C-alpha cells in the first residue's frame, strides 16, 4: 500500500499553505502551481513510485529503480490547478518491488523535499 510522505519541517511558507500536521499543501490563492516532490530512499534494490495526489486521487507519478549502493532520490513534478479554497495535494510513496526501503539513509545529503510554487492565476 502507499504511504504518505511526512514532510514535517518547513524552511519557507510565505502564505501558510502547507500544513505540517496533515502533510497537505492547500493554496489560498486560485491558480496554477508547479508541484515538486523529491523523495530520498535508502540503499536497497528495487522499484519505488512517488505519487502526487490531488484531493485524494493520484495525479502524477514517477517510478524509480534503486540500486543496492547509497540512497537515491525519486522526483515527480506536475503543474496543478487549485481553486484557492479546498483543493490540496499530498505526496505518497509506494514500493513496487525489492526489499523494504526507508526514507533517507541517515546522512545530511539524503533530504526529501516538497515545494509548491505559484505560476499564474486561473
Residues of each region from the PLM?
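Short, surface-exposed tryptophan/glycine-enriched loops
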Residues: 71-96
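Intrinsically disordered, low-complexity segments enriched in Ser/Pro/Gly/Ala and basic residues
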Residues: 1, 20, 56, 77, ...
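Terminal (often C-terminal
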Residues: 1-46, 62, 69-70, 99-122
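Short, surface-exposed beta-strand/strand-loop-strand elements in extracellular ectodomains
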Residues: 45-58
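Residue-level recognition of well-ordered beta-strand positions that form the cores
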Residues: 36-40, 51-53, 79, 92-94, ...
Amino acid at each position: 500500500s502507499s504511504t504518505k510522505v511526512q514532510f514535517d519541517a518547513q524552511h519557507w511558507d510565505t502564505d501558510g499553505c502547507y500544513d505540517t500536521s496533515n502533510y497537505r499543501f492547500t493554496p489560498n490563492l486560485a491558480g496554477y502551481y508547479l508541484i515538486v516532490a523529491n523523495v530520498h530512499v535508502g540503499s536497497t534494490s528495487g522499484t519505488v513510485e512517488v505519487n502526487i495526489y490531488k484531493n485524494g486521487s493520484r495525479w502524477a507519478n514517477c517510478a524509480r529503480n534503486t540500486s543496492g549502493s547509497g540512497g537515491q532520490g525519486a522526483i515527480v513534478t506536475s503543474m496543478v490547478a487549485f481553486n484557492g479554497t479546498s483543493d490540496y495535494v499530498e505526496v505518497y510513496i509506494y514500493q513496487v518491488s525489492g526489499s523494504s526501503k526507508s526514507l533517507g539513509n541517515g546522512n545530511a545529503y539524503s533530504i526529501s523535499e516538497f515545494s509548491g510554487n505559484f505560476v499564474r492565476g486561473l
